[in-house]
């Protein structure tokens, strides 16, 4: 194993290195390398932004016939991440930077150009002052004038700041706040006025609707009162339906008096009951004088008959639709029993 780990090699006495064949490779050979974008750039084809530090698999080659102080310059080929367009840039050893060559534009290039222009102007001035002492004096006078102008401008700015310092900013803010509060209060009052008007309109409409409903109900009640009922409707009329038509306490009292008073006095049904005439008095004429008891009874009945006829006529004249409708069942029963008693007598 130690023989395979030798540190020196054996060269025979007739060794000639020029006779060893060498591998001939092309000078513009390309290598695939992994690198990061050296600056921010934007693709000219699709407008995609490629930021500094993004990694690419680039192809590297040596630029032919271009050297800087004997240092070779390398070119790199990358592809856009969006449209796969080819972008090339190369090294710039003079400025220790990279220079964009094709396929994209470098961002923040304007700032770099301005800096380069300033450096160029400064270099030209130094070259002029190096060989011309009068140029040095002219540049000094120009610089002094520029400095005086700058000081004057600075003094004007200070005076302007002092003038503005005298302004009462707190008072201005207070006035602005007061104006805002007044405007808000005015808007609130207008809103309240509008809501009040809307509520008044709705209230008037509701009052009109209620008035129309009351008028309709009154008309219905009047129509119910003016309906002419038949005398026989009192037998089929229900007390619950008849009591709904009452509108005053006086009418209720009168109806109650009529219904209850029918127990002792012949009621409203007296006009509806047909009285039977005595068959003996109608068929047989009385030839003989009646006995004293019969005469007395006859005088009593004769005295009662006109009274009953008067009461029946007055009851029939006093019968109204309201009384017919307001008769209670107890009053009807009493009146009917009175009529039966009178007929049986």
From Swiss-Prot:
<dbReference type="GO" id="GO:0046872">
    <property type="term" value="F:metal ion binding"/>
</dbReference>
<dbReference type="GO" id="GO:0008380">
    <property type="term" value="P:RNA splicing"/>
</dbReference>
<feature type="binding site">
    <location>
        <position position="43"/>
    </location>
    <ligand>
        <name>Zn(2+)</name>
    </ligand>
</feature>
<dbReference type="InterPro" id="IPR007590">
    <property type="entry name" value="Saf4/Yju2"/>
</dbReference>
<dbReference type="GO" id="GO:0071006">
    <property type="term" value="C:U2-type catalytic step 1 spliceosome"/>
</dbReference>
<protein>
    <recommendedName>
        <fullName>Splicing factor YJU2</fullName>
    </recommendedName>
</protein>
<dbReference type="GO" id="GO:0043524">
    <property type="term" value="P:negative regulation of neuron apoptotic process"/>
</dbReference>
<dbReference type="GO" id="GO:0043518">
    <property type="term" value="P:negative regulation of DNA damage response, signal transduction by p53 class mediator"/>
</dbReference>
<dbReference type="Pfam" id="PF04502">
    <property type="entry name" value="Saf4_Yju2"/>
</dbReference>
<feature type="binding site">
    <location>
        <position position="83"/>
    </location>
    <ligand>
        <name>Zn(2+)</name>
    </ligand>
</feature>
<comment type="similarity">
    <text>Belongs to the CWC16 family. YJU2 subfamily.</text>
</comment>
<dbReference type="GO" id="GO:0000349">
    <property type="term" value="P:generation of catalytic spliceosome for first transesterification step"/>
</dbReference>
<keyword id="KW-0747">Spliceosome</keyword>
<keyword id="KW-0862">Zinc</keyword>
<feature type="region of interest" description="Disordered">
    <location>
        <begin position="205"/>
        <end position="345"/>
    </location>
</feature>
<keyword id="KW-0507">mRNA processing</keyword>
<comment type="function">
    <text>Part of the spliceosome which catalyzes two sequential transesterification reactions, first the excision of the non-coding intron from pre-mRNA and then the ligation of the coding exons to form the mature mRNA. Plays a role in stabilizing the structure of the spliceosome catalytic core and docking of the branch helix into the active site, producing 5'-exon and lariat intron-3'-intermediates. May protect cells from TP53-dependent apoptosis upon dsDNA break damage through association with PRP19-CD5L complex.</text>
</comment>
<feature type="compositionally biased region" description="Low complexity">
    <location>
        <begin position="327"/>
        <end position="337"/>
    </location>
</feature>
<feature type="compositionally biased region" description="Low complexity">
    <location>
        <begin position="308"/>
        <end position="317"/>
    </location>
</feature>
<feature type="compositionally biased region" description="Basic and acidic residues">
    <location>
        <begin position="217"/>
        <end position="232"/>
    </location>
</feature>
<feature type="binding site">
    <location>
        <position position="80"/>
    </location>
    <ligand>
        <name>Zn(2+)</name>
    </ligand>
</feature>
<keyword id="KW-0479">Metal-binding</keyword>
<keyword id="KW-0539">Nucleus</keyword>
<feature type="binding site">
    <location>
        <position position="46"/>
    </location>
    <ligand>
        <name>Zn(2+)</name>
    </ligand>
</feature>
<comment type="subunit">
    <text>Component of the spliceosome. Present in the activated B complex, the catalytically activated B* complex which catalyzes the branching, the catalytic step 1 C complex catalyzing the exon ligation, and the postcatalytic P complex containing the ligated exons (mRNA) and the excised lariat intron.</text>
</comment>
<dbReference type="InterPro" id="IPR043701">
    <property type="entry name" value="Yju2"/>
</dbReference>
<keyword id="KW-0508">mRNA splicing</keyword>
